[in-house]
Each structure stands twice: as C-alpha cells, then as structure tokens.
C-alpha cells in the first residue's frame, strides 16, 4: 500500500467517524454558552440514533435512497423533544444540571431497548438504506489531493464542517449569538437589558438537542447501520470532551472532533495501515477513550467555561 492510499484511508475514515462528534459537540457549545451544562449529550445521541433507525425501517420502501437523510431530520426532531426534558428541569425547575443530564443518559438507552422489544421483539435492529461513501465531483480528480481528501469520503462530514463555520458565525457575529453568550456569562445583566434569559437558555438547549440528535442519527445511518443498547457507546462523552478541548468554540469543537475521529478511525482501519497493524487491536480500540481521559485531565481545569455555566437563574422581582 502506497502513501497516498494510506492517507486516503485515514482521512476518509477520520471524516466519517468525526462527523457525529462535530455535530454533537457544537450542540454542547450552544447549550453551555447559554449557561446550561449538558452532560446528557450521550443520551440525546442515543435517542437520535434510535428514532432515526425506526424511521428508516418504517419508510425505506416509500423514500428509497432519500430515507437515511430524512431519518437524520427525524432524529434531529426527536433529539430536540428529548432535550426539552433537560430544559424544563434546568431552566424552569432549576434542577442540578449534572443530575438532569445524567437522567437523560440513563433514560435513553433503556427507553430505546424497551421500545425495540415492544415494536420488533428483539434487542437490535439493522437498516437496509445507509449513507454510503461519496466522491466529490471535480475535486476528486485533482492529483494526489483529490485522492486523499475527496475520494470515497463522507458527504455528512463536509456538511458538518460547514455547520461548524455557520455556528461560529451565529454565535459570534449575530444578535442571537451575542444574547445567548450574555445569558451564559452574566444573566442578571442580560435580564436588566431586557433579554429573556429563560427563552435564550431554552434555545441553547434545544439547539443542542437538534445537533445531538443529528449526530446520533448520522452515527446510526452512516457508521453502525443498526441500533442497540451499545450503538453510541460513549460517543456523547467524547463529544463533551471535544467541546471542552475546543474551549466552547464551534471551530475549536470541530477541530477537536476531527482529532478524536482520527483516533477512532485508527482503531477501525489500523489493521490495514503499515506500522499500525502490528499494534494489538485491543490497544487501538481503547485509544479514543484513553485520549478522552487524557484531554479531560489536562484541560478541564485550564479551560475557562462561561461564567454562569451551570448556574441556575432566578429572576429578581
């Protein structure tokens, strides 16, 4: 295997495995920039994956090759609805953010497996219509670069990069983003200026639900091709680490997700790559999770979160 083919395998798989992380970590950015800690990203991804797979199986005969894409939209919708539980608990009822997010993480896989038994009488379901690999028109014909970056790659991956750029623009260059960040930094001052703190915090959590649902749906539609209790398997927690490593910035979260995606891709395709295939597969499979622990240990104390992140707001009378 030559260098170009090796790089093509690594880059293509890195983009595929980082895509769910990019969407979900950006969702976490919106939630926490608004002041709501969302450790429930794992649960949101799980419910997004479950709902997208059910939609895929139900409508595949109707929509054909468009089914996976519509399934992603359905996963986004269900992710938003599921995240509203977190919004009610933290924004309206002023519950502890960590406890509320943990409830989502515990509820989602249990609910998914229960409904699988109810609907299909089994603990795992597979889909027939998946998102396949894609050659970028024109760009894939560029010598060397086209082979590495634009051949047999992931269309959702490129969409995720576009979403990251748009999210950065919304967060830092629009009135909505300025107000969302203000309620995450100093909600009292924002309220004094007439900004509805509760509404913007709700918006941040719902955006995290939409993007987390998309992340889970893409994982099911493009990577696993199924849903079971172990489908997501820590991807939400890795997304949370990517958000922290990226310093609550959409671009930083995207770059961090690409790095985590690289480690995950090496765990999957390492057996095909000279110099890596000699490493025991068990070490490669644990690498993404070990790297997550290292990142959190090194950067959690140093990364500066929004000042009011995790602080419940009580409107003054």
Curated annotation (Swiss-Prot):
What CDD domains would the database entry show?
Answer: TM_PBP1_transp_TpRbsC_like (cd06580)
Key word Transport present: yes
Q: InterPro entries given for it?
A: ABC_transp_permease
Which cellular components does GO assign to this protein? plasma membrane
- Transmembrane stretches in the record are 9-29, 35-55, 62-82, 98-118, 132-151, 155-172, 203-223, 225-245, 251-271, 286-306
| An example Gene Ontology molecular-function term | transmembrane transporter activity
Where does this protein reside within or beyond the cell? Cell membrane
Tell me any Pfam family this protein matches: BPD_transp_2
- Subunit structure and binding partners: The complex is composed of two ATP-binding proteins (NupA), two transmembrane proteins (NupB and NupC) and a solute-binding protein (BmpA).
The UniProt similarity line reads: Belongs to the binding-protein-dependent transport system permease family.
Give the protein's biological function: Part of an ABC transporter complex involved in the uptake of all common nucleosides. Responsible for the translocation of the substrate across the membrane.
> What is this protein identified as?
Nucleoside ABC transporter permease protein NupC
Q: What species was this sequence derived from? A: Lactococcus lactis subsp. cremoris (strain MG1363)
